[in-house]
Amino acid sequence: MKPGIHPDYRPVLFHDTSADVFFLIGSTAETDKTHTHTDGKTYPYVTLDVSSASHPVYTGEQRKTKSEGRVAGFNKRFAGFVGGKGA
């Protein structure tokens, strides 16, 4: 590899601020901030808005937008008209 053109790969402390969870991961992310981790060492620090600790897809708290099909919704809406009094 050519020297001097690759970013430094080092441990970086990522903080998911919405879930208040820290991840210590090897990364090339650039930052001027530092933070002391629970192991007593100081690492470069990057804040995150969303991570696997807080995203609804990973936490299982996603909303069900469509719980039934279109036909079931139609039948539910017009159930009073079907099977009513015969002529």
Curated annotation (Swiss-Prot):
Superkingdom per UniProt: Bacteria
A Gene Ontology BP annotation from the UniProt entry: translation
Single GO term (MF): structural constituent of ribosome
InterPro entries according to UniProt: Ribosomal_bL28/bL31-like_sf, Ribosomal_bL31, Ribosomal_bL31_B, Ribosomal_bL31_sf
PROSITE patterns assigned to the protein according to its UniProt record, in alphabetical order: RIBOSOMAL_L31
A Pfam family: Ribosomal_L31
Bilayer-spanning residue ranges: none
Keyword vocabulary terms for this entry: Ribonucleoprotein, Ribosomal protein
Cellular component annotations (GO), alphabetically ordered: ribonucleoprotein complex; ribosome
Subunit: Part of the 50S ribosomal subunit.
UniProt record similarity statement: Belongs to the bacterial ribosomal protein bL31 family. Type B subfamily.
UniProt protein name: Large ribosomal subunit protein bL31B
Organism: Pseudomonas paraeruginosa (strain DSM 24068 / PA7)
